[in-house]
Amino acid sequence: MTHANTQDTITQYLSSCGANASHGREQPEYLGLSLRKRHELLQRNPALAADWAAQYGQWSVHADSHYRCLTSTREAQAPWYRLGVKDTVDVAGLPTRLGLRSYRHYPQRSAEALTFLDPRIALTSKVATTELNIAFGAGCRNPHFPSIDPSGSSTGSAVSVAAGLCDISLGTDVLGSVRWPASHCGMVGLRMTQKAESLAGVFPLSPRMDALGWVTRSADDLDVLFPLLGLEPLLGQQQALKDRYRVAILEHALDPALTSPAMLDMLGQARSALADLGMAPGEVAMPELWACRGDAWQLCARDAWLASAAWARRFDCELHWSTLSALKVGEGVSDSDYQRIHQRMDTLRGGIDAWFDQAQVDFVVFPMDPNRPFDRRNPQPGDSTIPSPAEPGYEQKISFTPLASFSGLPAITVPICLSADGKAPLAVQIMGRRDSERQLLDIAKRLQAVTGLLPTRRLQV
């Protein structure tokens, strides 16, 4: 009788369990092309799609093993573009797991936002999310900025695009859940106007702030694909494009006691670029909306806590401690405060168009966050993704993302430069009126034409 050596056996298994290591470990060159250039090449020579699909097949198994952002995949025959969908959005034929370890359902139909996709866009994957949108960590790695936490909750949406596994990804944005991962990965992230009718088939977290969001490498990439997404029934009457937009920097974010020197310097670079475009920004205050940032977090927390009774009955699985910590914050929001926040939101949203008219601006610009993106972190039991008013540093923790969320407005995040050490992307947010998605794409494209795309390396795993 022979006896296997435990260490030798596991070593042998690990050496042979992955994809063929002899090829496919370097990102294909075609994935470095802009989508506009790829579109031109495919129009001239459609056979390229099959060649590129073969290269993608070799790359994807290595890339996803390393970056760990895809939760389900399905085959597509030589697609022109690949779409990933956050695992809180239903896709017929693929399981929806909601970031939970031991739950899934198989939807009969796809979410409303996916109804009218152009056939050149293939929905090829579901992508990772944090548990129920409110926990720490989706298990993904940041492709171009490996020391930076990719953030959440639409983590896989940003990581899959940054890794070249998707050309575009659909996520959801409640309080920054698309904008944060996009900015942390050096991508562009668009939060759309909040509309209940656009959210059929999307897991609800905070229904009055939930919104669809899209991630691409650049504003121009998103501009190429936006007409192919079939969103016309959801977009509404869009604000008209202009030769010059009226732009203002948010005065509150200029406070050096709140916003770090690095982010203020980045904002200065964005300001100069806008001036070069003939749209020199002024400054504007939004005191009523600014005062609601904490309310946005409290509303989200309370909504999650109220829904948790239904979750517990349906999911029947153990929740991560950080999910429970976030729910605990919601439990502490009183019924009277909850009603007060709803009334405050109604009042603010009812007057937001008049505010833009009176301020004579089309866009308000401010940093993505008070500080640079945070490094990979190791949260401990008791920590929560939802800040509590009693926490130290609360004004910084509630950040700037709730401004678009509480008002229901669209916003786009655009990377402007790298941090001084070159390890982190620094980004602005541009917030527009309701139904200004096309305007936001337009100004973001122009801004990136001046600032340029962030330098990135060709990925190898």
Go through the PLM ranges and name each one.
Residues 88, 128, 252-253, 286, ...:
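Short, well-ordered beta-to-alpha junction loops that form the rim of enzyme active sites
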Residues 38-45, 102-105, 210-217, 329-333:
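Short, well-ordered beta-strand elements within core beta-sheets of diverse protein domains
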Residues 3-167, 171-174:
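Gly/Ser-rich catalytic/binding loops embedded in alpha/beta enzyme cores
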Residues 138-146, 293-308:
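Charged, often glycine-rich, active-site loop that binds/positions anionic groups
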Residues 39-44, 309-406, 460:
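Serine-dependent amide/ester hydrolase catalytic core
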